[in-house]
Design a protein with these regions (language model features):
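Glycoside hydrolase catalytic-domain context in secreted enzymes
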Residues: 1-663, 667-669, 675-678
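Conserved small/polar residues in nucleotide/adenosyl-binding loops
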Residues: 703-706
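Low-acidity, Ser/Thr- and Arg-rich intrinsically disordered low-complexity segments
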Residues: 672-689, 694-701
Length: 706
């Protein structure tokens, strides 16, 4: 940020009265016409496309994007989202529309850690691994904000700082207790990277308390860690109405004035909600100083200046027009992202891909076969066209193949029609299966039953999941259809891990499509018939039930995620198949011993031994040999996505930065010396292996020079 921007912000704020300053700290900020400051609504969403503001390109949900492991793709998507946001903002502003969701401060990405598969909002995240989350979060932020240090294309926001991942039902009163080790090893890592590597403009505080302090008013989180330790220079915004929780649910204050003052005094600059309507009263009572308020407003003015909202400080992006919204190129990128996000979990005897010449009749069965909700997740925009799996198969196969359809059952209820008897669509599904050559079962969830408290419709769990089984009658429907004896392909639509133990044993192929975006059905159909090879990898662990998981409210990382669990799992983190095989050899490093401040370069030859072009995700894992017992086992520390043509070999280089060798031994982050094992893998050889199966293994020693 330039000195000019900082001085301009100070000049603007110095001319404001105390009431005017406070007015700018509310998410609905009024105009100050005498200073040339237009009205502005800070609340805008862009989790996987511009959301809630009309037509936009709807990309796969964040968890699906995470399955690509591809930072270049995610940054490109962020840039497209920002371009569409700019196009909308520019035209809305010309027409005097400054309403909610029409601005440029996007409250995304969500870089919380998906530590427990029951969390309803996990599909908003990039999965369970801090390294992957940090990499992808930074990529999306760079795409949204652009590369001009003094002119923001849009402003990103890393949320929810910092220890936040359910339960949804008690988020307004819950105290998440986390050890210093888990804080720095897991919960803070991605936020730190977003601040230091991507220069994220905003950070949103969470609803819950963290070790006794409400996150939106925590001196430890917002001042000691975020600003002093991480060097954050942007603004902090509260989650919506979270500051009221201070006195209403957390009981750390007695009045709304005390709550507003606590938030500002500890580093919260902007209030999504109503608490700061009482900030003047808090000021009059001496609970908060003019200096604290001024500092907050200066930070808010800095971002508005950098976004080009002041007439004396124009934006280089102000000529982007509405024509870019959902244009052909953007739609094509969304479909490509859907293709890249699909994870092939099972392919018995290379059953897939199908040969369309051999399929005369195909049955598409299940509550998600023709569901738009199963395409889009939450925090979505409006697409001008949706393509469900049913529609994708119909369009792909044309008139030459008959496509039969049956809903089979409701997503979670025992009947589809209210006056009917239970299982009212079962028999139709069985008839369709009997008449087909192959069956595509489209099962899973959607954001009406896994999502955010207050948004998701499952009032029994406030958006969270009670277990990992398919809901309602879906499992029973799957078993009944499979019993017909026709080949079955299961296409899963969900934003989280599902226990597919029965399906793993009994169906021919399984594809996880996540929530693949508005036109994701096109990608599903193309994958089934071999137009491309699926290449996605799981960004989460698929467990066999929840019986061996810790309590949902337990924020210790012990026995959680691939980094700390010792349990047998159904599909491990990083797992995903191709059509055909890729093989690795020639693993080497540029040095067997290195100074702690030096990067290490790792090389491996990767060969595509198939007739399909593949986007191979090369994964590098590190394990510290002499690590403390509370340290993770193997953990992801390197990713390289390489496109390989049929039968092509490429030499791939992965660079491990010095910090990737660090262990968290609070308050230090370095051991004086250690030996680390490096493993490079495409995917575990078998779904039930706990650590990605290494092609080969190398030890690397490094020394910490004091």
């Amino acid at each position: 940020m330039s000195k000019k921007t900082i001085e301009y912000a100070k000049k603007l704020v110095s001319q404001m009265t105390i009431d005017e300053k406070i007015s700018q700290m509310l998410y609905e900020s009024p105009a100050i016409e005498r200073l040339g400051i237009p009205e502005y609504n800070w609340w805008n969403e862009a989790l996987h496309g511009v959301a809630r503001a009309g037509v936009a390109t709807v990309f796969p949900q964040a968890i699906g994007l995470a399955a690509t492991f591809d930072t270049d793709l995610i940054e490109k998507i962020g840039d497209v989202v920002s371009t569409e946001g700019r196009g909308k903002f520019n035209e809305f502003s010309k027409k005097g529309d400054h309403g909610i969701y029409k601005g440029l401060t996007f409250w995304a990405p969500n870089v919380n850690i998906f530590r427990d598969p029951r969390w309803g909002r996990g599909h908003e995240t990039y999965g369970e691994d801090p390294y992957l989350t940090g990499k992808l979060g930074c990529a999306y932020i760079r795409g949204l904000q652009g590369d001009d240090p003094d002119h923001l294309k849009s402003a990103a926001c890393a949320k929810h700082f910092a220890v936040h991942s359910g339960p949804e039902a008690i988020r307004h009163e819950f105290d998440a207790k986390a050890s210093k080790h888990d804080m720095y090893d897991t919960y803070l890592y991605a936020f730190k990277r977003c601040v230091k590597d991507a220069k994220v403009e905003a950070v949103m505080g969470a609803y819950n308390r963290v070790n006794g302090e409400p996150a939106c008013g925590s001196r430890t989180l917002l001042k000691d860690i975020l600003r002093d330790e991480f060097g954050f220079e942007g603004h902090v915004v509260s989650d919506c109405w979270a500051i009221l929780d201070f006195h209403e649910h957390h009981h750390v204050t007695d009045t709304v004035e005390e709550s507003a003052a606590m938030a500002v005094n500890n580093g919260c600059d902007l209030n999504c909600g109503s608490a700061f309507l009482h900030l003047k009263d808090a000021y009059d009572k001496g609970l908060v100083s003019d200096e604290a308020i001024t500092a907050a407003v200066e930070r808010l003015m800095e971002v508005r200046i950098r976004l080009g909202m002041m007439k004396d400080y124009p934006s280089p992006y102000e000529d982007i027009s509405y024509e870019v919204v959902e244009c052909k190129e953007h739609v094509e990128l969304s479909v490509e992202a859907a293709r890249r996000s699909l994870v092939l979990l099972k392919n018995k005897d290379n059953f897939l891909p199908l040969d369309r010449k051999n399929v005369k009749t195909i049955a598409v069965i299940g509550p998600n076969a023709n569901s738009r909700d199963a395409l889009i997740g939450n925090y979505y925009g409006t697409s001008s066209r949706y393509i469900t799996p049913l529609e994708g198969l119909q369009q792909y196969l044309g008139e030459d193949t008959r496509v039969l359809y049956a809903e089979g059952c409701h997503l979670y209820k025992d009947k589809v029609q209210g006056l009917a008897e239970e299982k009212d669509r079962f028999k139709e599904a069985l008839i369709m299966a009997e008449q087909s050559d192959v069956v595509v079962m489209c099962l899973g969830l959607d954001a009406t039953i896994e999502g955010e408290e207050g948004d998701a419709g499952n009032e029994y769990a406030s958006g969270d999941k009670l277990g990992l089984m398919l809901p309602g009658l879906q499992e029973e429907l799957l078993e009944a259809v499979a019993a017909v004896g026709k080949p079955v392909i299961l296409v899963l639509s969900a934003g989280s891990a599902i226990d597919l133990s029965w399906a793993e044993e009994h169906v021919d192929a399984i594809i996880d499509s996540w929530y693949p975006g508005a036109r994701g059905g096109k990608a599903v159909a193309e994958a089934i018939f071999g137009e491309y090879s699926p290449s996605g990898k799981l960004p989460v662990t698929f467990y066999q039930g929840t019986e061996n998981l810790p309590e949902f409210t337990d924020y210790s990382m012990a026995h959680r995620t691939y980094r700390y669990t010792n349990e047998n799992v159904l599909y491990p983190f990083g797992y995903g198949l191709h059509y055909g095989e890729t093989n690795y050899d020639g693993l080497s490093v540029d040095k067997a011993e290195s100074d702690v401040n030096e990067p290490v370069e790792v090389f491996v030859n990767v060969t595509n031994d198939s007739r399909y072009t593949v986007n191979e995700i090369v994964q590098l894992y590190i394990r510290h040999v002499d690590a403390a017992e509370y340290e993770p086992g193997y953990q992801l520390k390197g990713i390289e996505v390489v496109k390989l043509e049929p039968y092509e070999t490429k030499k791939v280089k992965l660079t491990i930065s010095p910090r990737d060798f660090q262990e968290v031994v609070y308050p230090s982050f370095l051991l004086s010396a250690a030996t680390s094992l490096l493993r490079i893998t495409s995917s575990p050889v078998t779904p039930d292996c706990m650590v990605p199966q290494a092609v080969s293994c190398i030890s690397v020693s490094y020394t910490h020079l004091r």
